[in-house]
Amino acid sequence: PCPLTSGPESESAQEFGRYQCAFPDIEKMKTLITSVQPGDSDNREAVAAHMYFPRLFTYEFVRSDDSNETNGLLNYGYSLVMSEVARKIAEFGYLTEFGIHHDSEKNPFNLACDLMEPFRPFVDAKVFELREQTLNSEVKNELIRLLRTDLPEFGTSLTQLINIFVRDAFHYLSGDDRLPELGFIDEV
């Protein structure tokens, strides 16, 4: 068990404490995250994910277990974010079928799958809050509201942040030298 703090700053301190307790080997994960190379030939992203999900939820948690309620929550949340990203891609006049890393002929949303990756932690954090819930209409509405949630650290909503990121990604892919950033690595 990991002790949580109390006091005037208790809510944010407790939230930090929960994540700190969930990730006692956070330094190892940071090293893995920052050492992922283009193409990830040594599979470091998968190793980090294998460490991440069991620590966030329970050590018995397996991401591929479709019978697990938490996986249902994650899948629903990710599909909402992917849909929003796909909508923005189409809004900017691009096709969702042609991805950068995702390239399945059976996936009509390859590019959306590529560009949604930085937003998965928002879903993960919300599902962490809802982890004791079952996927019903009330919980689905909670996950839908996540898209409109204000993110004080970014000064905007998640939907608007997705819009900015997709726009900046297309500027970069069109030859702009500035790579879009959200700043997640610095905050890990």
Model-found features: residue ranges?
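Active-site helix-to-loop segments that bind/position phosphate- or nucleotide-bearing substrates
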Residues: 1-188
